[in-house]
Amino acid sequence: MAKDIRVRYAPSPTGLLHIGNARTALFNYLYARHHGGTFIIRIEDTDRKRHVEDGERSQLDNLRWLGIDWDESPETHENYRQSERLPLYQKYIDQLLAEGKAYKSYVTEEELAAERERQEAAGETPRYINEFLGMTEEEKAAYIAEREAAGIIPTVRLAVNESGIYKWHDIVKGDIEFEGGNIGGDWVIQKRDGYPTYNFAVVVDDHDMQISHVIRGDDHIANTPKQLMVYEALGWEAPEFGHMTLITNSETGKKLSKRDTNTLQFIEDYRKKGYLPEAVFNFIALLGWNPGGEDEIFSREELIKLFDENRLSKSPAAFDQKKLDWMSNDYIKHADFDKVFALCKPFLEEAGRLTDKAEKLVELYKPQMTAAEEIVPLTDLFFEDFPELTAAEKEVMAGETVPTVLEAFKAKLEAMSDDEFVTENIFSQIKAVQKETGIKGKNLFMPIRIAVSGEMHGPELPETIFLLGREKSIKHIDQVLATL
């Protein structure tokens, strides 16, 4: 690539880091790192009504948790927040006003609403009608004087070239174009409070920071022609644009909505539940991008090496919670034990289960976990009363040979000394029951597992019995035998 690659993620500090915004940050990060470019964080905080205290810190903390780093940000550079850049925006607004490419608009919000209502009632597409249309210079001056005398604070609008064609080659979607006449008329570039609107400020920022590529969600496609108008008015070269497809709910097929409460949509949720960040990073990287091939598990370094913007999907990306959980389980299974135990420790501590067996329990259930918080319900067997058996479990325990198996195994446990009660010997005693009774396979192992653990499936049975202890294992078997 000929020009220096400079990309940015520019969040608003209006809340937690959503999975869609995390994807935008991640794809820009991968693009920059793959091409040896620069990844920038810029904070778009001009919407003061939606500003959330600690919103910026939350965004940055969650990006760091994911494993995303950056080269420039408000932490290291001055004026990387829009609220710190107001004089720069004013400079270019004044320039456009002086050149006649923008003008002050005194129409009130009430008048705009009334006109919009009239247009909708007439079946017209709502658009701003230039309030100075048909006025002489004298009439225009009188109108402005009257409005200013009434205390009306103007906005500033960009004069739109209605006959202009605004087109670009989108990195993801190919060629896109809009007609200037379909934008909705002259649009506001500066609000009454003096703050610039998004579509003006973002152009000034991207130009000033020499952004080469803008990669974002396709909900920004409609913003792009307006931004191209600003580039044109100021005589600047526009960056390349790429608009990623929306993320859909895999179950409904509809756009992922914050009202989908069954889906974890904020990175903070995954942190709190004890997911490994590498798993979430890997999963998000495959939301709308495919490296080719059958593999789906990739390290951050592998994703950086493989990332190719030409493989960004034109089809919606399905957010599949089950796939994320499968991926997370794979990461936990292959992670260092110390790393997984460190994740589980706070949950065990809060539940009062940080005993001398804690490490062994985490080791036992590590292959089953999707997230560290699951260590608490998984270890209920060791800290709670014996659970009520399900209908399926009761059906297994109604088998003809079950009492024989349980009585025989109970006798083996009772005959073992404390020194003999170790995992290897427990397995040997199960095999001894098989040899003595002739009962094997599921008819042997399933009744013992259900009688000891109250579940049909679980981790290694001998290790479970060892950690549960001989007395408690015998007690559980007696409880079940009493119901047969």
From Swiss-Prot:
A motif ('KMSKS' region) lies at residues 255-259. Keywords: Aminoacyl-tRNA synthetase, ATP-binding, Cytoplasm, Ligase, Nucleotide-binding, Protein biosynthesis. It is an enzyme of class 6 (ligase). It is found in: Cytoplasm. ATP binds at K258. Its EC number is 6.1.1.17. GO terms for biological process: glutamyl-tRNA aminoacylation. Its main location: cytoplasm. Gene3D superfamilies: 1.10.10.350, HUPs (3.40.50.620). A motif ('HIGH' region) lies at residues 11-21. CDD domains: GluRS_core. It catalyses: tRNA(Glu) + L-glutamate + ATP = L-glutamyl-tRNA(Glu) + AMP + diphosphate. Monomer. Belongs to the class-I aminoacyl-tRNA synthetase family. Glutamate--tRNA ligase type 1 subfamily. This is Glutamate--tRNA ligase. It comes from Streptococcus thermophilus (strain ATCC BAA-250 / LMG 18311). The gene is gltX.
